[in-house]
Amino acid sequence: MSASHEKPRSVEVSSTLSSLESSDLSEDRSDQGRHLTVGGKVVRIVIAFAMMFACALAPPLLKQVPVIQSFALAHENPIGLVESFAVGSCVLLIYGVAVVLALILCYVLGRTLDRGRHVSVGLRTDRRALLWLAGMILAALVVDLVVAGMLHVFGIAGGGQPLPQSPAWLMIVESFSIAFLLQGIPEEIIWRGWLYSSLGETRFAAVSSVLGFTALHILSQGGQQNLLEHLTYLAPPCGFAVTALIVRTISGSTWAAIGVHGGFHVANDLLSDRLHLPVGSITWVLQGLIWAAVGLLILVFHRRQRRLATSSSSE
């Protein structure tokens, strides 16, 4: 299964990055990327890897603090509005540490490694950025619905997995915290925010942003049983990383990429059991291919709109 889809996915990634280079990445800012030495580029990629590990480990380490452990044990089954609010706030604060750490590290890098360079993490919040964020979350829900529909047509949908029995509000808080505070926001700040900008928003920056992020998931544990599944498990992060890069470039906002990344995890968490998505290579490859296709469609539409705008202004 993996071999039959590996080539199309690599072709899609290559063509996407090529299109981006020829249109959206050929701005003046790319000059600072070309002025970087090979060593400077390698250092930045290594730092991105280290930052991602640091942000991922921060919440689990915080949970080991005795006070927090005691609070969690004493409020395993919260009763009443006040206790529920306290538990929900604690969950948000624990996972929010990853976001705070990512922002602090990017600030320090801006004051040291990138001092004097035009590097931006792209977190300016305005109406357009929020629309991109919401739109990509909605796209993530649609992607899972399409994957589920295809699997049902193929007759290979999963069985009826038992749904979580936690209170609905706690499921929503935990899903949001893990999808956005632990993964979507800090990881996109690092890969599509800081690293992409620090490398000059060039083709090399785009490739590094996508492939570096994808490669890290070889260490993830998501139900893989063998080598083939460890490889096909890379399809979703590769696919949505391509789309995250495209929308980051088109919108100029990392919030769009955060919508892709966080939306992917929210959709998986809330819909996988309800849509009977099987855990395995077929689901992962379909998700990766459809996400890459979404990114390519957005890119094609964007380029078409630019051509129409250019032709109308020249008349």
Task: Describe the function of each predicted region.
Residues 233-246:
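Hydrophobic alpha-helical segments embedded in the membrane of multi-pass proteins
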Residues 185-208, 249-253:
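Membrane-interface helix/loop boundary segments of multi-pass membrane proteins
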Residues 62-89, 115-186, 201, 223, ...:
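Juxtamembrane helix-loop-helix connectors linking adjacent transmembrane helices
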